[in-house]
Amino acid sequence: MIMKELEKNYNPSAIEEKLYQKWMDNKYFHADAERGKREGKKPFTIVMPPPNITGQLHMGHALDNTMQDILTRYKRMQGYEALWQPGTDHAAIATEVKVIDKLRKEGVDKHDLGRDKFLEACWDWKKEYGTRIIKQLHKLGSSADWDRERFTMDKGCSDAVLEVFVKLYEKGYIYKGSRIINWCPVCQTSISDAEVEHEEQDGFFWHINYPIVGEDGRFVEIATTRPETLLGDTAVAVNPEDERYKDIIGKMLKLPLTDREIPVIADEYVDKEFGTGCVKITPAHDPNDFEVGRRHNLPEICIMHDDATIDCKGSKYDGMDRYEARKAMVEDLKKQGLLVKVVPHSHNVGTHDRCKTTVEPMVKQQWFVRMEEMAKPAIAALKNGDLKFVPESFGKTYLHWLEGIRDWCISRQLWWGHRIPAYYCQECGEITVAKSMPEKCPKCGCTHLKQDEDTLDTWFSSALWPFSTLGWPEKTKELEYFYPTDVLVTGYDIIFFWVIRMVFSGYEQTGKCPFNTVLIHGLVRDSQGRKMSKSLGNGIDPLEVIDKYGADALRMTLITGNAPGNDMRFYWERVEASRNFANKVWNASRFIMMNMEKAPVHEVSLDDLTMADKWILSKVNTLAKDVTENLDKFELGIGLQKVYDFIWEEFCDWYIEMVKPRLWNDEDSTKAAALWTLKTVLINSLKLLHPYMPFITEEIFCNLQDEEASIMVSAWPEYKAEWNFEQEEYAVETIKEAVRAIRNVRTSMNVAPSKKAKVYVVSENQKLLQIFEHSKVFFATLGYASEVFLQSDKQGIADDAVSVVIPEASIYIPFAELVDIAKEIERLQKEEERLTKELARVTGMLSNEKFVSKAPEAKINEEKAKLEKYTQMMEQVKARLAQLK
């Protein structure tokens, strides 16, 4: 085999696109159900959370997809028929907003264009921009089966949506009714809770007196943040246990600014300790009030049009914008002497994440899914162990949502999306739900039917994603083999909006939980811990990182130190450290391959291996076992850290340095063993690193093996009992400890590596001395020793020799010939003076209350870090001075 020499420097941009195309051309990402069955393979399936076709790759996508890719590559190498099912989401409102904006710039109005032409424009937009994020995922190295790419509005997914809607309607689980929903007055559609952003805003509590009917001069005082909704009040509620108001329960109140009277009702929803203990109930404009209203059969009076202007015929406020009406009503209350006081108050306000308009809760006729029965199997799944969360604590979040679940509003007043398959008879008004337009009304026989104008919530089709992408409702071979899927990787922010809905949909439609594990990750925040956002201008483009440092460096940065479920901070320094690690791997591989070119690598017997060879082989063997366990437990960050530590420290810093004399000596009888060990350990290390850093490992592996090989379809390293060398591990770890101690002493004494020194090792442990006897070469090459003396006592060792203790031995190094003691003491004393001044300065700053209260947090942390650093340096200087004196 002729090896291709690696380039001198690792250049990710020169190899990544080429390698990705190679993987695609060879269909390495493709999973085949028939092949899997034929070859007796176990399936492994992950469904990609479908990114919006409006989206661009952000750090959240990068983290989410890197985690999925790691698991898929790992299982593929283990011999599973691994399917990572990709696709995109039609993102109803997000896409509609984009297309409306594009048309507006062209001078075209959505409604003037008409529904059919507008949908054509949406499909054109999808064709032009919809694959952008997929191409960006390619750059990340995602090994999804792109031949199977799906779209939530493709024919298969659309057929699944129709099937489910009709089934649920026929079972009575889907109904049309009036309930409270989130309404966007600008987009003029209902929106999901996921599309509502809650932010704290400064506002007011307006305290208003409601007169008690028939009792002149007696009032009930309420406090509200939204006085304009007063027009829709249908009751005032008090807590039944509140002694202050027991005598007025059941009495009528005169509703200010109207000619209506409303009752005082008792409901435990009211918190006696909050505000006045009296709550105005507006069932049509508040979710909690809606529930109270339903319990007490209160009227639901909607007082707003779809554009959030007041709808109150005959009133002076009719047609006013809600905020204009607020001002006018407050002024009128003041004039009538009913405004008691206005108190500043901060409260959460819901805004639409698309247009930033304040969302209006409204009771409207919409389509809903009845959730009580459908939630039961989803609750049981977690409790009986069919479904688990990593971390486990997120199972509580899941249960909390399910046990308090409300009926799901699934209709949207949009054009882009799955149109609701309900047809209205224009003669008798009968509603028919069917997969296609009925020829005639089943009730009256009229042939004039009209389809519902609304479309379905995007999450409706997303809820079917794990099985609709595999061909359901058809009984396909893919569905039979790959379903249920194995793991879902997603963020904690969509447990309710997506995870729960997939679980209950899976049970309802297939009788199975759609996945057995949900691996939760947190958010990627900026270096200050802030959420990345356009408004803060702190977003970091993953593609910018990839272009500058390579995909592997970004992937490593996102996974290192990233624990499941926790948010992580993004630091450019970590990206640079990841790039440096890639360079370390590249340079070590290049060194090994250059030596392999000079002498061919032959298979050797384990008996031919030296102590150092057996040590590193045993270490990589244990590493394979540990990393396998970590990946099986979804401890991705821990596994990567172990691979990093092994390659950088054990393999590069120790083993390669240990074997260099053998490689450079053609007469050394153990050279063949060294080369075989280097190649074997390198290949195993690359395989363990591959799921995390696929590009660099592929490039090195192909050059190490042959051009046609691919590491991604090679076998995952397995633990081998014959590679377990406990004695050699103990011996080399002991040598490392001794060499490390010698290096530390030399550094503390400021002795250059070029200056060789005698080393005395004193120990009563003969076994230890025997280990050192066979390792004198390491003391010379790694510990810069001119000579090594092994003895059981201190005889012949100079009194001024510097000593250091390691387990069961003492090491002495006479430095008198190498170091001018007087000059070294003088240097250290000057350093002590400098550090004393620096410590005084930093301590003074940190004890200054003015500085601490006004300085930026980053500056304070910087000074704290200096204090810690200078304190450690001072301790070291004092210890060295004590040694020398």
Predicted regions and their residues:
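N-terminal, positively charged nucleic-acid-binding surface of large information/translation enzymes
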Residues: 2-241, 265, 282-295, 299-314, ...
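Structured ligand/cofactor/substrate-binding pocket environments in proteins
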Residues: 60-72, 79, 88-89, 157-160, ...
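Secondary-structure transition/capping motifs at alpha-helix termini
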Residues: 73-81, 102-115, 135, 139-144, ...
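Short, polar/flexible loop-turn hinges at active-site or ligand-entry regions and domain interfaces
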Residues: 105-120, 388-389, 543, 564-576
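Short Cys/His-rich metal-coordination motifs, predominantly Zn2+-binding knuckles/fingers
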Residues: 187, 258, 355, 426-428, ...
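Short acidic-hydrophobic surface loop/beta-edge motif
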Residues: 206-213, 251-256, 350-354, 423, ...
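Feature 926 captures the class I aminoacyl-tRNA synthetase adenylation module centered on the KMSKS loop
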Residues: 207, 400-460, 464, 508-551, ...
